[in-house]
Amino acid sequence: SVIYQGFSIHGNEPSGANSSILLAYYLAASNDKFIIELLNNSIILIDPCMNPDGLQRFASWVNSNKSKTPNGNSYDREFNEAWPRGRTNHYWFDLNRDWLAAQHPESQARIKTFNKWIPHILTDHHEMETNSTFFFQPGVQSRTHPLTSKANQDLTKKIAKYHAKNFDNNDVLYFSGERFDDFFYGKGSTFPDINGSIGILFEQASSRGHIQNSVNG
């Protein structure tokens, strides 16, 4: 199998880019039997930061505006980026709306890689509101694009059960099948669905900086 893992296409959602390095290290260094078997039977493509300019802009903001002693208050300047923020690329365009149009160099390179490898699964790692939990697809079924096959959605649900089981075993809050959708094919989690692959969106509650208080702690 070929698995394409894409991280932080929105630059101010940095947990994906940060975790991608840990993922690469874990895959390279682990002697775990499961990981060795996985690597023997899979090709894993890691796109550690799909929006490097946005991530750099975000990092510059939070590192310049953080307190010497970390302050988790949401009103702190660190968590309130000035426009244009780190979500967009160098040209201030949302790259997660450019998968179909492919007008930007990051998108063109990414789609070229996608077409070269034709991955079975593409993961798209994002962040959402600080007071949320964790989301993984499938999304709202009534907002799935009509050209997306039933087989695609059935496999997405099957993969979701695997995630749910592991979240339950670790007492981690999550939700699935609501709020987010699979309609517009210009996004990283849906572009694969019309191109013979399975796109999976992951959304993690964001700190939007170094540390931020939330209703969950």
What positions do the PLM features span?
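Structured catalytic-domain cores with a bias toward divalent-metal coordination
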Residues: 1-217
